[in-house]
Amino acid sequence: MEHKYQIFKIKEKKFIVKMDLNPLTNEFEYHMYLRHLITPQQAIAAYFSKTYETFNPERNRYELYSKSLNITVYYTYLKEKDILLITAFYQGGQYE
């Protein structure tokens, strides 16, 4: 499967989002939207409004939950400050 990435710069942070080729439309769309109907803007908002965050050493990623948005986000750091948003999805009550 062919991939591209899109960059969002917000509050001095660079968020990198994977895009996948949609086989039905033959156009690139956000991976997290194709899989979970979450936009990068929603995932970034969840990053800034996180209620809970932990590091998962088995997966080498951070996992956060935003109670106000009811969204879980998986991400990792690239080049110290750049953030690769791996995926995001709705998941209520996980850390309550």
Task: Spell out what each predicted region is.
Residues 1-96:
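Ribonuclease/tRNase effector modules and their secretory precursors
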